[in-house]
């Protein structure tokens, strides 16, 4: 079959890779680089070139078994990574690193800082309570829950909301609006509520473009970047995908949409109730 995969993040790349074993697969990406969140930049610091991933960061063996197997299938090297979190509040002496007691009290004045101690003890209470919590109100947002639990402003503003905002790359207001159920499941599954014995995290050796380029070379068809898909029309015998300012189109037997759900819905002609 002739198949189109729309979106070149990890979902699109892996789908295109496995389908390429038996089919002709073309890959479409709306941006000027392949990889989605996996985006490596080269920086020159003090006349030294360093490569930095600005999206793809880390994974572990427990939570990402399919990704681990995907990397093994393609002989992609990985290495241990340090996943850490720190906060420094501008124009104050309020700062800490989240890695252990020594990190929390790396600023020795924190021992005598009442606001910091409020945050610290709320952190311990919050993590212990929510590590195995399974019964909660599905209608609550994270912000609602923090208010309901009467947690300190310091814990809310200088710890949990900044951490959520950092993990999902969103502003603090949006972090507070996150559904409580999603937040709890993610933190529980990733061991982020554990005060000790957290999982070992890993990253791709030589940065994420290493795996992106390797997978691109194994895709059976063409790679199209800067191709924004406008519309997908489904017919009985085939599927048309329209792209670009001139609304030109390709014809395929099957199409895999590997984008965010809202993007997928916006390009589907006549989506079904189930798809909505």
Question: Which residues fall in each region the model found?
Answer:
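N-terminal Rossmann-like FAD-binding beta1-loop-alpha1 element of flavoenzymes
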Residues: 2-27
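Conserved Rossmann-like nucleotide-cofactor binding loop
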Residues: 11, 33, 262
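N-terminal glycine-rich dinucleotide-binding loop that anchors FAD/FMN and/or NAD(P) in oxidoreductases
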Residues: 41-67
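Central helical "cap/lid" subdomain
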Residues: 234, 241-276
């Amino acid at each position: 079959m002739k198949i189109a995969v729309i979106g070149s993040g990890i979902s699109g790349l892996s789908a295109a890779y496995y389908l390429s074993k038996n089919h002709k697969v073309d890959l479409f990406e709306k941006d000027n680089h392949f990889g989605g969140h996996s985006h490596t930049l080269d920086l020159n610091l003090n006349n030294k070139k360093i490569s930095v991933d600005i999206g793809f960061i880390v994974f572990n063996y427990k939570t990402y078994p399919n990704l681990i197997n995907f990397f093994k299938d393609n002989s992609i090297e990985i290495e241990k990574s340090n996943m850490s979190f720190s906060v420094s509040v501008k124009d104050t002496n309020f700062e800490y690193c989240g890695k252990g007691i020594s990190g929390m009290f790396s600023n020795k004045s924190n021992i005598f800082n009442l606001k910091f101690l409020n945050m610290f003890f709320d952190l311990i209470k919050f993590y212990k309570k929510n590590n195995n919590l399974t019964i909660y109100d599905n209608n609550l947002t994270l912000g609602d829950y923090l208010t309901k639990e009467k947690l300190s402003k310091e814990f809310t503003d200088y710890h949990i909301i900044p951490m959520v905002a950092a993990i999902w790359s969103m502003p603090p207001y949006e972090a507070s609006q996150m559904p409580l159920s999603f937040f709890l499941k993610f933190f529980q599954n990733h061991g982020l509520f554990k005060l000790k014995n957290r999982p070992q995290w890993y990253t791709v050796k030589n940065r994420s473009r290493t795996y992106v380029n390797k997978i691109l070379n194994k895709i059976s068809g063409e790679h199209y970047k800067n191709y924004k898909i406008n519309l997908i029309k489904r017919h009985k015998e085939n599927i048309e995908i329209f792209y670009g300012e001139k609304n030109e189109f390709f014809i395929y037997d099957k199409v895999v949409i590997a984008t965010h759900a809202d993007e997928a819905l916006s390009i589907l002609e006549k989506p079904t109730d189930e798809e909505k």
